[in-house]
Amino acid sequence: MEPAGERFPEQRQVLILLLLLEVTLAGWEPRRYSVMEETERGSFVANLANDLGLGVGELAERGARVVSEDNEQGLQLDLQTGQLILNEKLDREKLCGPTEPCIMHFQVLLKKPLEVFRAELLVTDINDHSPEFPEREMTLKIPETSSLGTVFPLKKARDLDVGSNNVQNYNISPNSHFHVSTRTRGDGRKYPELVLDTELDREEQAELRLTLTAVDGGSPPRSGTVQILILVLDANDNAPEFVQALYEVQVPENSPVGSLVVKVSARDLDTGTNGEISYSLYYSSQEIDKPFELSSLSGEIRLIKKLDFETMSSYDLDIEASDGGGLSGKCSVSVKVLDVNDNFPELSISSLTSPIPENSPETEVALFRIRDRDSGENGKMICSIQDDVPFKLKPSVENFYRLVTEGALDRETRAEYNITITITDLGTPRLKTEQSITVLVSDVNDNAPAFTQTSYTLFVRENNSPALHIGSVSATDRDSGTNAQVTYSLLPPRDPHLPLTSLVSINTDNGHLFALQSLDYEALQAFEFRVGATDRGFPALSSEALVRVLVLDANDNSPFVLYPLQNGSAPCTELVPRAAEPGYLVTKVVAVDGDSGQNAWLSYQLLKATEPGLFGVWAHNGEVRTARLLSERDVAKHRLVVLVKDNGEPPRSATATLQVLLVDGFSQPYLPLPEAAPAQAQADSLTVYLVVALASVSSLFLFSVFLFVAVRLCRRSRAASVGRCSVPEGPFPGHLVDVSGTGTLSQSYQYEVCLTGGSESNDFKFLKPIFPNIVSQDSRRKSEFLE
């Protein structure tokens, strides 16, 4: 807020500008129109369009209107014709009282640009009031010794009309003693005087009754009468005389009721009743509304009503002093009303625009006029508004002010302003008037919708039902009304191969997203697209957000056993030497699961066995191993059923059936892996050297016992028949892979070749790591051979 010392220069500048405007406008001659009082409502007064040199259409475009001094609605501008017409009957006496001429000041306001044309309407008087006397009967006491030509003042009649329609003449009923003389005061008003023509004789006629008639100058003339009772008294030598013929006093307008204005004093040289004086008020310039009261005994004049300098600035009174003998004297009292700062400044709003668009700088919000009924310094004013609003005042002509915006407003920051207009006069003490106006700011579409998040991640479990609600996006708009109404849409995907319109849809009103079809995690794990939010303003504004949909895997795939194959053909038979140690690797069940995550975590367990406790299955890798030492009492042929189960909910499973044959003195040649195995090709070089060395030693040993082993194998016919395995033609399904990261194919194994009867194709199966058993087997065979 600015310090007071900084604001006073601005206020002085505004005051100086107003004074300059007043001086400038004083040279303009206002247009004057006239109309008779009591003219009917709607009567033609003037053609303002022609007088202003404007077209009728231009008056409407510029918002022409008529503003009067006291905001009276007596005049109206017809924008269709450009004519100034009466909006109501005008009563001159009510508008101006005795003031002549009766002039109504008004202005014609035009906007875009702002122009003010001053004009006056003269309301002429018609003779619509008759003269009226203040009393129904007047009583005069006249001594019989009064000389001829003696003048006796009479109370005048009052007529609300002015000019020639006021009282012009007085006459009295025919009689032999008196006639009436009509006198004219300085203000032009007429008053009667009774003049004695012949001597009076109390003994002949003690009283007379006459009729006084007041006649105005109207056409036709109007009149009023009063009865005069004249009482003839005995001789009275001296008439009362006032100390002063003229009393001049000044009274502040804020004097309280009952205050003493002045005391008049008269004296009479007679004694007794002839010297007793009484005072009376027999003429006032404002008899319609007299604010004074005269004491008949003391001559004190006191206020009985509040004075108002702005209504009447002076009063003229005639005081009569009468003695008991019927003689009288008179004096005049001139009362000047002194102006005090007793009127608060006034503000009248001519136009107010609310709401106003938020993006409209230098926009006129209000046009108003200020005035102070006081005079001099008491009537000078300063107009201001508070500092914390983006508005300013621009002085115009004829005490008009324009309230305009300083710059563009922002409805989203503030949608309503309460502006207090303060008017302070320069009187002592200073009087202040405040008036508040409310200005609403209308919305302009200057804010785009904003999503609550720049990106959304939605999770959908596969195998969902079509039309499933998968999530929502939300955007808000800081504007209001239709500018804040948001509609949602799917934007074209950046990936041209993504069938977005067949995957999801969006509710344009609330941003709800729906899946249009059942999603398959194995076919589509995730996809993303953009959504748009557009408001309904003009022009429309929009924004966009990214939506990422992640398809959650469901346990909809059972484990698939890769080895041993479960295709209904002759199963492979695994050969296990009876000399195998506990933990001997018989084979490995290899399985995969098309799901992911824990749905693809596989576990193995031995479901059935010919001889429980002989074999065991490792739960995590599917390796089938011997659980104890084999003996000759164990049956040679075993059937194992291995259960492969995933970790889904609910879990899915598959089974693998194995044939295991226990043999005596069985060994297997080493066969190198195919060159195509990428994992073996990348084995550690040290391991390769060790394997080569071990293979060389084994080869030398095998060569020494080759004939012996071959003879033993040939003797066992069943060994030849069960050594075959059947493998289906064609590769394994390519999509069956282990996705667990620790699947059953994570280790490297050697393979052996099985030749099936009647076929020249080579098949494979896992080669059991027999090297640790060769030494023990060879030792046993050597002992047998030596025996």
UniProtKB/Swiss-Prot annotation:
Phenotype when changing residue 719 to V: In a breast cancer sample; somatic mutation
SUPFAM superfamilies noted in UniProt: Cadherin-like (SSF49313)
All ranges on the Cytoplasmic side of the membrane: 712-787
Domain Cadherin: 35-133, 138-242, 247-347, 352-451, 456-561, 568-671
Side of membrane Extracellular, spans: 27-690
Domain of life: Eukaryota
Record localization: Cell membrane
Cited function: Potential calcium-dependent cell-adhesion protein. May be involved in the establishment and maintenance of specific neuronal connections in the brain.
Protein name per its UniProtKB record: Protocadherin beta-15
Species, as recorded: Homo sapiens
Lineage: Eukaryota, Metazoa, Chordata, Craniata, Vertebrata
